[in-house]
Amino acid sequence: MLTVVGMGPAGRHLMTPAALEAIDHADALAGGKRHLAQFPAFGGERFTLGADIGALLSWIAARRDKGIVVLASGDPLFYGIGTRLVAHFGIEQVRIIPGISAVQYLCAQAGIDMNDMWLTSSHGRCVSFEQLANHRKVAMVTDARCGPREIARELVARGKGHRLMVIGENLAMENERIHWLPVSAVNADYEMNAVVILDER
């Protein structure tokens, strides 16, 4: 059985008991280097996931008789690896154990409700700045290519510099920082972040 577990934004201290139990019973464990390092005592086979998703799919396919757990950042189905694995193997063959997404964690820390929030991501994908500008409350996971500064620049160009950006940096880590800034004032680089954009009207 293939199981995909959400690790939350920073590691095992935010994982569910079900996720930790799945890892305890796994024959093989796959994930990014940072994720695998959270489980130094795991004695089974390991696969370090890089940019080549095809290599992961082949590795899993060759071990279908084993209990495989794939470690996913945040929540596996919020712009995560779980989506790709379900599409490839089918939901009948994949068990998803949810995790806390970076967006959920940031909203909890900042006291921002998610009831009317538009969710998206610029992590490894293109984002529509027109859609960002047209929604009153947006939350997204970002990356180095399209981070808070790049998003702010595009919003200012669309007349949205008055809006508020909440930037969660290194979430759930010892060096976590949460910044509240007008979009027009965002002009720095931030590490491993999620962003909420609010319309102050």
Swiss-Prot record:
GO terms for molecular function: cobalt-precorrin-7 C15-methyltransferase activity; protein methyltransferase activity. Pathway: Cofactor biosynthesis; adenosylcobalamin biosynthesis; cob(II)yrinate a,c-diamide from sirohydrochlorin (anaerobic route): step 8/10. Its EC number is 2.1.1.289. InterPro entries: 4pyrrol_Mease (IPR000878), 4pyrrol_Methylase_sf (IPR035996), 4pyrrole_Mease_sub1 (IPR014777), 4pyrrole_Mease_sub2 (IPR014776), CbiE (IPR012818), Cobalamin_biosynth_MTase (IPR050714). CDD domains: Precorrin-6Y-MT. It catalyses: Co-precorrin-7 + S-adenosyl-L-methionine = Co-precorrin-8X + S-adenosyl-L-homocysteine + H(+). The keyword Membrane does not apply. One of its GO terms (biological process) is cobalamin biosynthetic process. Keywords: Cobalamin biosynthesis, Methyltransferase, S-adenosyl-L-methionine, Transferase. Belongs to the precorrin methyltransferase family. This is Cobalt-precorrin-7 C(5)-methyltransferase. The gene is cbiE.
